[in-house]
Amino acid sequence: MTFSKEWNLAYKKNLQINNWPFSELISYTIRFSKLKKTKFRVLELGCGSGPNIPFFLSLNVEYFGIDGGTIIINKLKKQYPKLKHNLFAGDFTHEIPYTGKFDLIVDRSALTHNFTNDIKNCLQLIYKKLKTNGKFIGIDWFSTNHFEYKNGSKTTDPFTKNNFKTGQFKKLGNVHFSNKRHLLDFFENFKIEILDEKIIYSKIPSQKKNFASWHIVARKK
């Protein structure tokens, strides 16, 4: 990964700043995690501007977050001083620098901005960092059915595009798109409990462009 300059620049310009938690991450976490367990440890990959932090803190879990953007992590440490030792700026595709293991690791559309080999490497790290029967929840991993898969510049990885000139991926560097077989390969060491594909067509106003992504719940065997 070696965190993209595009994302750090976006954070510096106060772009890609989300103030509200992602509803699907909340619903999948509540539905598929045993949150009543004491001393429940959660790690969020690509925590960004921290929109999901209030949700996890409300559950009285021990929260940790890692993001490649030093700018945004420094802002979060000022916003959440009690978490300053739990927030880390670094490349989570090559290192997850926390001691101990986690009950839950979540990612909302962060890993899906990397090349295949980096994602595979990160999933190996995730597997090692999860407790037995611990779960990984991935939300909005972009699908090859997304209309933008036809756009952008090709790379050496057939599933990864970049240099998007318009749309939601403009100036965001690499974007990874997956199909079912590709995801099954990614999670071959896990037990996949849920694999949902979300495809959205806007009818009012009518648009021919569709959004498509995957939601994944995978358990460490």
Regions found by a protein language model. Give the residues of each.
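Class I (Rossmann-like) S-adenosyl-L-methionine-dependent methyltransferase catalytic domain
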Residues: 1-40, 45-97, 118-121, 135-221
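A conserved beta-strand element that flanks and buttresses the S-adenosyl-L-methionine
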Residues: 106
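Short catalytic micro-motifs in class I SAM-dependent methyltransferases
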Residues: 109-110
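A short glycine-rich, Lys/Arg-flanked "PGG" loop and its adjoining helix->strand segment in the class I
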Residues: 120-132
